[in-house]
Amino acid sequence: MDIKIIKDKKNPLLNRRELDFIVKYEGSTPSRNDVRNKLAAMLNAPLELLVIQRIKTEYGMQESKGYAKLYEDADRMKQVEQEYVLKRNAVPGSETEGEEA
């Protein structure tokens, strides 16, 4: 799996970086968690401050386009992001995964 960042925008108002990226892969589409781990490693950033907003795959293509946000602190991330997005990006096995609302 290769990830290429095509746009990196700093948003000082929300204390975050906004990233557009392309994921190229062989076989099945990688999971959101796999992409998030690889992207965090590429950016040298803490995993818990990286939120993948969307990943879109075109039919028959071996690549996906995505949009992610890297926050400077967790408090700001919790203020800005909607709860379902935070649950979707929860690390498997954490206490927030699978909780009933």
UniProtKB/Swiss-Prot annotation:
Biological process terms in GO annotation: translation
Ranges in coiled-coil conformation: none
GO molecular function terms listed in the Swiss-Prot or TrEMBL record: structural constituent of ribosome
Domain of life from the UniProt record: Archaea
Entry-linked Pfam families: Ribosomal_S24e
Keywords: Ribonucleoprotein, Ribosomal protein
Record bears the keyword Transmembrane helix: no
One GO cellular component term noted in the UniProt record for this chain: ribosome
PANTHER family documented for this protein: 40S RIBOSOMAL PROTEIN S24 (PTHR10496)
Family: Belongs to the eukaryotic ribosomal protein eS24 family.
Designated name of the protein: Small ribosomal subunit protein eS24
Organism: Methanosarcina mazei (strain ATCC BAA-159 / DSM 3647 / Goe1 / Go1 / JCM 11833 / OCM 88)
Lineage of origin: Archaea, Methanobacteriati, Methanobacteriota, Stenosarchaea group, Methanomicrobia
Gene, per the UniProt record: rps24e
